[in-house]
Curated annotation (Swiss-Prot):
Description of its domains: Adopts a seahorse-like shape and consists of four domains: head, neck, body, and tail.
EC number assigned by the record: 2.7.7.-
Species: Aquifex aeolicus (strain VF5)
Name recorded for this polypeptide: A-adding tRNA nucleotidyltransferase
SMART domains from the UniProt entry: CBS (SM00116)
Origin: domain of life: Bacteria
PROSITE patterns reported for this sequence: CBS
Domain CBS: 305-363, 367-423
Reaction it catalyzes: a tRNA with a 3' CC end + ATP = a tRNA with a 3' CCA end + diphosphate
Length: 824
């Protein structure tokens, strides 16, 4: 039985609900609207006028799929047994429907979500459709002035205006109107807003790059809430080769007319403007920010504090509090009561002592209640005085009784360090390889248009600096990486594979494999566990990485394209050929990094830094490899197998005794070592002489490694490794047949006998046999000559003319081949 979709509106549904419902009818040809009992005044008027556009039913069918718009509260009195599925399009976070399909996302109007899907699916709409859909977005965003309005709402509306939405009719029903170009410009401005605090004042910056300048755009600026609520703001619009700057101020301290006069413009304290040529919006923004800092800056606590802060609640037990601090690598934390008010500070050092005696007691019994706090607008020198003169390790930053941040000595040192780095211009330019140059610049352009920042990151930066060819490129985006990837894919007409739960997307353009990821921070709930992930800055994204040489980035943003970003000395370590972890608990957070460190050291012929080596040994001795996810360890060994310098990696495995922790029953011995080095010579010879017959030689090294294990253990390990069938067959042959074959080969006097014994064998077995010194020449002879012996076609035809066929012919051919081989 086919169950139709039925849209049911909530009691008193508004214009956004009605517009979204109509959009659902466009999305689903089998959808109907249950005749609404009561609508808001505007929605009722529109429904009456557009009644012919809606497919309406008055009674619910025996079975149906329920569609909810602008809500995900289940209407009362519904026959739930008839509902087969629930679909939701809502922008409110609260609701009682738990299992559903569809979208609940933070936008200004539910209709926006439906319009996005209509656009994505390429569903055709006419001007009347577009008008009906536009009603909801205009109303629920309050003419784009409500706090919840997003760039997505503006872009959805721009799409509807392109489809012919009737502005006159919209104005009559809802509002004053703007052009599609103005709406698109507003979307870009809202998306790019950046807030900074200078001398305790919030100053906002926004930029937009437009095809054509919109003459009345400045009249819209006060309608943008985030700008309107700033003490001052600067909106910078780049269009048709010119850059327009508008400044507005509501603060006695910030005279925008005077500021813009330094750039050739003018005005008064409350408003100013300037028009410039041949200079980008981003460049002007940075120049204005630099000017403001020189003129006004007196560094405040809010400029350097960590926010949002990690806090503990006073009822948490000593044991749980210690776990929380340990997982996050935090030494001290503010403690709050159930009302969210600050009551004290607790340290990890104190908890380590208390956990032995009072593990289950609440921390409110032990917090330090004698401490200093600061407001966000306090000068930094006050923080420095508290930290140095009074010995307090952490300062809670409190505003209106709420902890809004924390400051440590490290924050002050870091602020000074960053200022010095800027003064010294330590960042250097890197030449982006030609094969990725075009895409990199395009990503930078798209990022600029979307108000994002994008960077090439990680191992690809390392390989670029080492002069290696790169075809797999990882980008990190400060902002929505998936949307950037989708736009790049759209421009190239390729598919994109988004993974919203991870904030990543993959796509392929020509030979290039591209991965985009939203900048994120990670915390590990326990050693080796998969991390908890949340959005962050580029710096926080880089600091979560494994080693300094993998924690560099190259900007692809137009204003600083090609700039190397190296917060942790990765370039220096690359030059010094050193593997160095970024922080002391790196191997504890993720023990798989032990194997990664050794893989990179072996591959690049680098050494571990002294501190990294010490930390690695400690992690191995603590048995952390046994706690790591088995699948990730196995995968890391498989990656090592593919390395050209796998033997060097194995030597490092041996040096730091890691395989003993991973493979049950494994032990190194001198015989295994000798075979490994003998195998290298054999492999090098085979790869050179028979390049067309190359196999994955890494598996041969692995077979030698596990040769001393009992068969079942070795077999199980190969199964874990998902070893190819030829590897497993070779291992079985090694354990049960190789010994007897060696003896037969040693006894073989004729070349033909050698040929007969070796012909059925896989190349892997032949190479393993060459490890026996007295068999090496026989195997070489077979590979180079014996297996190539064939009778000329003429000779075979002659035998056939003699009346030989079938088995007799085969036996005669073998006799002749035997004669030839034995003469070699």
């Amino acid at each position: 039985m086919v169950c139709p979709k039925v849209v049911i509106l909530s009691e008193g549904a508004d214009l956004d609900s009605l517009s979204a419902a109509y959009g659902v009818l466009k999305l689903y040809p089998d959808a109907y609207l249950l005749k609404p009992k009561h609508l808001s005044k505007k929605a009722g008027e529109v429904f009456k006028k557009y009644r012919d556009k809606f497919r309406v039913i008055e009674d619910l069918p025996d079975c149906f799929e329920l569609v909810l718009v602008d809500t995900h509260f289940l209407p009362e009195g519904l026959p739930r047994e008839r509902i087969k599925r629930i679909i939701v399009y809502d922008h409110h976070p609260i609701g009682d429907v738990k299992e559903f399909e569809g979208k609940i996302e933070k936008v200004g109007a539910a209709t926006t979500l439906v319009v996005e899907e209509i656009k994505e699916k390429g569903i055709d709409i006419n001007p009347r459709d577009a008008t009906l859909l536009a009603f909801g977005i205009y109303e629920d965003t309050g003419n784009f002035t409500y706090e919840g309005t997003t760039p997505r709402d503006a872009l959805a509306l721009a799409f509807l205006l392109e489809k012919g939405a009737n502005l006159r009719e919209i104005r009559e029903v809802v509002m004053e109107t703007y052009t599609p170009e103005q709406i698109e410009a507003v979307g870009k401005i809202v998306q790019s807003i950046e807030k900074v605090f200078i001398n305790g004042r919030q100053i906002s910056f926004a930029t937009a790059v437009l095809e054509r300048y919109q003459p009345d755009i400045n009249t819209l600026l006060y309608e943008i809430k985030d700008l309107k609520e700033s003490d001052a703001f600067f909106v910078i619009i780049e269009a048709e080769g010119k850059t327009y700057v508008f400044g507005r101020s509501q603060s006695e301290d910030v005279d925008v007319g005077e500021i813009l006069s330094h750039f050739g413009g003018g005005g008064h304290r409350e408003a100013g403007a300037v028009k410039l040529e041949n200079v980008s919006a981003e460049r002007i923004k940075e120049l204005i920010k630099a000017f403001l800092k020189r003129k006004y800056v007196k560094l405040k606590v809010r400029d350097i504090m960590n926010t949002p802060p990690f806090v503990l609640e006073e009822h948490v037990s000593v044991k749980d509090a210690l776990t929380e601090l340990s997982e996050r690598g935090i030494a001290n934390a503010p403690v709050i009561n159930r009302e969210g008010k600050l009551v004290g500070i607790i340290s990890k050092k104190a908890l380590l002592k208390l956990v032995k005696l009072y593990p289950d007691e609440p921390i409110e019994l032990f917090v330090n209640r004698d401490f200093y706090t600061l407001s966000p607008d306090a000068p930094v020198w006050e923080a420095e005085e508290i930290l140095t003169k009074f010995g307090q390790k952490l300062i809670p930053v409190v505003e209106d009784g709420t902890v809004v941040g924390v400051v440590t000595r490290l924050d002050i040192l870091q602020a000074v360090k960053e200022d010095l780095e800027k003064l010294k211009e330590k960042r250097r330019k890197i030449k982006v390889p030609e094969n990725i140059e075009e895409i990199a610049r395009e990503v930078g352009q798209i990022a600029k248009e979307m108000g994002l920042r994008a960077y090439i990151v990680g191992g690809v930066v390392r390989d670029i600096l080492l002069g290696k060819e790169v075809w797999d490129v990882d980008f990190v985006v400060e902002g929505n990486a998936i949307e950037l990837a989708k736009e790049l894919a759209r421009r190239h007409g390729v598919n994109v594979h988004p993974f919203p739960e991870f904030g990543t997307a993959h796509l392929k353009i020509g030979k290039l494999k591209l991965e985009f990821a939203t900048a994120r921070r990670e915390t590990y709930p326990r050693p080796g566990a998969y991390p908890k992930v949340e959005p962050a800055s580029l710096k926080e994204d880089l600091i979560r990485r494994d080693f300094t040489i993998n924690a560099m980035a190259i900007s692809v943003n137009l204003e600083d394209y090609g700039t190397l970003i190296d917060y942790f000395g990765g370039l220096r370590d690359l030059k010094d050929k050193v593997i160095r972890v970024l922080h002391p608990v790196s191997f504890i957070e993720d023990p798989v990094r032990i194997l990664r460190a050794l893989r990179f050291a072996g591959r690049l012929n680098f050494k571990l830094s002294r501190s990294t080596e010490k930390l690695l040994k400690q992690a191995v001795n603590l048995g952390l490899l046994k706690e790591a996810p088995r699948g990730r360890l196995i995968n890391e060994i498989k990656l090592a197998l593919r390395e050209d310098r796998f033997l060097e990696i194995l030597e490092l495995y041996r040096k730091y005794r890691v395989l003993e922790e991973i493979i049950e029953g494994f032990q190194w011995n001198e015989k295994v070592l000798q075979k490994l080095y003998a195998l290298r010579k054999v492999v090098d010879w085979h790869a050179l002489e028979f390049s067309e017959e190359r196999i994955d030689y890494g598996w041969l090294y692995l077979l030698i490694l596990i040769s001393n294990l009992d068969y079942e253990r070795g077999k199980h390990f190969l199964e874990e490794m998902s070893a190819p069938s030829w590897v497993r067959e070779t291992y079985k042959f090694m354990k049960f047949k190789l010994g007897s074959l060696k003896e037969e080969l040693k006894k073989a006097k004729e070349n033909y006998e050698v040929y007969r014994l070796l012909k059925p064998l896989h190349t892997s077995v032949l190479l393993l046999l060459m490890l026996e010194e007295e068999l090496k020449e026989k195997i070489k002879l077979y590979l180079e000559k014996l297996r190539k012996v064939k009778l000329p076609k003429e000779k075979i035809e002659e035998l056939k003319k003699q009346g030989l066929k079938g088995k007799e012919l085969g036996e005669r051919i073998e006799e002749l081949k035997r004669e030839i081989m034995n003469k070699i």
